[in-house]
Swiss-Prot record:
Interacts with HscA and stimulates its ATPase activity. Residues 2-69 form the J domain. NCBIfam families: hscB. Keywords: Chaperone. It comes from Acinetobacter baylyi (strain ATCC 33305 / BD413 / ADP1). This is Co-chaperone protein HscB homolog. The gene is hscB. It comes from the Bacteria. Belongs to the HscB family. SMART domains: DnaJ (SM00271). The keyword Signal does not apply. Co-chaperone involved in the maturation of iron-sulfur cluster-containing proteins. Seems to help targeting proteins to be folded toward HscA. SUPFAM superfamilies: Chaperone J-domain (SSF46565), HSC20 (HSCB), C-terminal oligomerisation domain (SSF47144).
Amino acid sequence: MNHFELFDLPVALDIDLVALKANFLKLQQLHHPDKALDKDQALIMSSDINQAYKILSQVDSRAAYLLSLKKQDHHLDQSIHDFEFLQSALEIREQLDEADSQEQLITLKNEVKQWVDGLIREFKIDYSDEDWSEARDTVRKLRFFQRVLNDIDKAEDQLLDEDSFDLDDDF
C-alpha cells in the first residue's frame, strides 16, 4: 500500500490537504500504541503513518514520492545545474538575509510561492510526459524553495520574538 492509498487519496501532486489531515488523525487514533493489543505493531504502524503524512503534506516531498512510485527518484540529491535558476536562488537568499521587516518577508514569501506555483505546473507536465530528468530537476528546485519558505517562517518568528520583547519595556 502506498502513502496515497493509506490516506485514501488519489495518486497525484494535487491532493486535498484537509482530507489528508483528517485521515491522518483518524489513522493515528485507530493505531495508537496505547490502545492496541500488539503495542509493538501499533508503534510501527503509527511511525509509518507519521512518515507518510510528513511526505504527503509538503509539495516537494510529495513530488519526490510520486517519482519514487515510478522508480524515477534516483539522483534527487544532485546539484542543480540551471545557471539562471541558481542566480535567482542566490538573489532570493540575499533578500532573505537582508530582510529586516515583516513586510519584506511577506513580499519575499509571495515571490517564492509564485516560483513554487510555476514549478508545480512544470512538474505536472514533466510527470505526465514521463520526462523524468526534467521532473527530477523540478523536484530539486521545489526542495530548494521549500527550505527557503521554512527559513522565511523562522525569520518571521524571530522578528515577532524581537518585537514582543524589548529590553526597554517596563515590567
